[in-house]
């Protein structure tokens, strides 16, 4: 089972479709791509928005998956 982590959006560029999340547990910032955002609306995140997510190892390092705004 995948562990859910909470964090705050450090920054997200809606034009480029990616950004970074700072986990609340103090671990290293995690890359997030718009395709990982679970939403029926336009997939974007706002700076300092609280989110819940899981982490998977991507081709360039850790990447957030199943991102849900709280």
UniProtKB/Swiss-Prot annotation:
It holds the Pfam family CSD. It is found in: Cytoplasm. GO terms for molecular function: DNA binding; nucleic acid binding. GO terms for biological process: regulation of gene expression. Disulfide bonds: none annotated. One of its GO terms (cellular component) is cytosol. The keyword GTP-binding does not apply. It comes from the Bacteria. Keywords: Activator, Cytoplasm, DNA-binding, Stress response, Transcription, Transcription regulation. Residues 7-67 form the CSD domain. InterPro entries: Cold_shock_CspA, Cold_shock_domain, CSD, CSD_CS, CSP_DNA-bd, NA-bd_OB-fold. This is Cold shock-like protein CspJ. It comes from Salmonella typhimurium (strain LT2 / SGSC1412 / ATCC 700720). The lineage of its organism: Bacteria, Pseudomonadati, Pseudomonadota, Gammaproteobacteria, Enterobacterales.
């Amino acid at each position: 089972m995948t562990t859910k982590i909470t964090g705050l959006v450090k920054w997200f560029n809606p034009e480029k479709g990616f950004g970074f999340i700072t986990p609340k547990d103090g671990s290293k910032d995690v890359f997030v791509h718009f395709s990982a955002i679970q939403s029926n609306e336009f997939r974007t995140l706002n700076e300092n928005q609280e989110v819940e997510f899981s982490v998977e190892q991507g081709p360039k390092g850790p990447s957030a998956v199943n991102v849900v705004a709280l």
